[in-house]
Amino acid sequence: MKAELSATEEQIKDYRLKLGDKIRIVREKRGYSQEQLAEKMDINRSTISKIENGKFSITVDYLVRFSISLDYEFKVIDKNI
């Protein structure tokens, strides 16, 4: 049986999901497919999919790459992401 997540782990999971949603929304507004954005960022399309679905903990390096590639300023910690 899987252990219950602590409040902090739940919050991290929630932020990951919200940030992934925001990245997907911005990507779609900019007219990029996951494949096109992956090529622009020089990463795998599957990595973008995992990030957008909250399955991958994004690093600051990736956040900067998304920001530059999508011409969008992401807020690192914002409860209203």
Identify the role of each PLM range.
Residues 21-36, 40, 65:
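Short basic helix-loop element that most often maps to the first helix and adjoining turn
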Residues 17, 28-29, 57:
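Short amphipathic helical patch at the helix-1/turn junction of helix-turn-helix
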Residues 1-18, 81:
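N-terminal flexible/basic segments that precede or flank functional cores
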Residues 42-56:
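Recognition helix of helix-turn-helix/homeodomain-like DNA-binding domains
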Residues 36, 47, 62:
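Residues in the helix-turn-helix
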Residues 59-76:
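DNA major-groove recognition helix of helix-turn-helix/homeodomain DNA-binding modules
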